Amino acid sequence: MKLAIYGKGGIGKSTTSCNISIALARRGKRVLQIGCDPKHDSTFTLTGFLIPTIIDTLQIKDYHYEDVWPEDVIHKGYGGVDRVEAGGPPAGAGCGGYVVGETVKLSKELNAFYEYDIILFDVLGDAVRGGFASPLNYADYCIIIADNGFDALLATNRIAASVREKARTRTHPLRLAGLVGNRTSERDLIDKYVEVCPMPILEILPLIEDIRVSRIKGKTLFEMVESQPYLNYVCDFYLNTADQILSKPEGIIPKEISDRELFSLLSDFYLNPVGNEEQENKENLLDSVVLI
């Protein structure tokens, strides 16, 4: 199974991806996480340091792809999760998306796609185009990470559009498995968006300080819980997500709305709270009538 995880930059994709990878490994799966970001920090919390990237290795090999072996680019991490980092050109130079596309192709050529139960692509931000869209060419499922904010849902809407387009043009099925809410004490905007653009909500993680600290420490929650047992409840969020993924959900081909419609939808939610409350009361009344 291949998973592509997308979401707004800075939303906590990499921290979430690493913990989901460990959760899948705890369920007995052999997992490879591929970091698709020029910052090459996707797998940081699996080791506590930045591993050599595909670009680093190619430079050493003088860009002779035929001289690259799996052990040159695949590195062991905590919990038995293997890791690859694409890397990218220096800031302000080259194309990070091209490097991501080449990383995906190289991983396939090295037979990495066939050696693991789960391949998890952790992909840069919401730029689902060019090389950054290449993981969707191979993924069985896309998972979107978002919070209860406008920018994250704008990114969610654009990612949904990309998934729909890829699902339309691909011969291999691609589905949106659902949305994971991260750092989300409230979920009113998420619920409002999902009401208009239906998609499964796999999990909602509240704002938990230990998750932020885990990123700084370079550890997953599963490693931290070994010395801090009270964090078991946080691990359960990720294990629940992993269990839903492993159940091979039907998933959906999502729909999206225009940017202007999204602006109106979310801003009206706060600008017209009375109207929203009246609508909710009408819906509750209708539900009561149906039950009677």
UniProtKB/Swiss-Prot annotation:
ATP binds at G10, I11, G12, K13, S14, T15, K39, N182, R183. The gene is chlL. Component of the dark-operative protochlorophyllide reductase (DPOR) that uses Mg-ATP and reduced ferredoxin to reduce ring D of protochlorophyllide (Pchlide) to form chlorophyllide a (Chlide). This reaction is light-independent. The L component serves as a unique electron donor to the NB-component of the complex, and binds Mg-ATP. Binds 1 [4Fe-4S] cluster per dimer. Its cofactor is [4Fe-4S] cluster. [4Fe-4S] cluster binds at C95. Homodimer. Protochlorophyllide reductase is composed of three subunits; ChlL, ChlN and ChlB. Its main location: plastid. It is found in: Plastid, Chloroplast. One of its GO terms (biological process) is photosynthesis, dark reaction. Pathway: Porphyrin-containing compound metabolism; chlorophyll biosynthesis (light-independent). GO terms for molecular function: 4 iron, 4 sulfur cluster binding; ATP binding; metal ion binding; oxidoreductase activity, acting on iron-sulfur proteins as donors; oxidoreductase activity, acting on the CH-CH group of donors, iron-sulfur protein as acceptor. Belongs to the NifH/BchL/ChlL family. It holds the Pfam family Fer4_NifH. One of its GO terms (cellular component) is chloroplast. Its EC number is 1.3.7.7. Coiled coil: none annotated. It catalyses: chlorophyllide a + oxidized 2[4Fe-4S]-[ferredoxin] + 2 ADP + 2 phosphate = protochlorophyllide a + reduced 2[4Fe-4S]-[ferredoxin] + 2 ATP + 2 H2O. This is Light-independent protochlorophyllide reductase iron-sulfur ATP-binding protein. Keywords: 4Fe-4S, ATP-binding, Chlorophyll biosynthesis, Chloroplast, Iron, Iron-sulfur, Magnesium, Metal-binding, Nucleotide-binding, Oxidoreductase, Photosynthesis, Plastid. Mg(2+) binds at S14. CDD domains: Bchl-like. The keyword Ligase does not apply.
